[in-house]
Design a protein with these regions (language model features):
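Active-site regions of metal-assisted phosphoester/phosphodiester hydrolases
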Residues: 1-115
Length: 115
């Protein structure tokens, strides 16, 4: 996994993101990469993915993917979860539903595959 204590990434997370890109960047098929990356949006690792894929968190200006209150304390906004798509995916809608059923909000994507 891409778990990293400080959420800023390190050499290991960069290599993991490079590996993800190696699997998808030359792929001519519709591609969606989704996950709890545990990395801040400005991290080098996320920036690597941004160069080759469309980051929907960034495109839709999402500020948080997690509840801001944990154990009664305000922990502030945090983006840890991402959806990346390639140019074979048409996004009809994307939202982060602020529903506290988990320690992460659900990411909801409505899309079509482009022929």
């Amino acid at each position: 996994g891409i778990w990293n204590e400080g959420k800023v990434g390190d050499e290991r997370t960069k290599k993991q993101c490079e590996y993800i890109l190696s699997l998808v960047e030359d792929n001519k098929v519709p591609t969606i990469v989704v996950g709890d990356f545990n990395l801040h949006p400005e991290s080098e690792s996320i920036q690597l993915l941004n160069k080759k894929l469309t980051n929907l968190i960034e495109k839709y200006n999402i500020k948080t993917t997690r509840p801001t209150v944990k154990d009664g304390l305000d922990v502030g906004d945090s983006v840890d979860d991402y959806i990346f798509v390639n140019d074979k995916i048409k996004v009809n809608s994307f939202e982060v539903k602020q529903n506290k059923v988990s320690d992460h909000y659900p990411l909801i994507l409505d899309f079509e595959i482009i022929d």
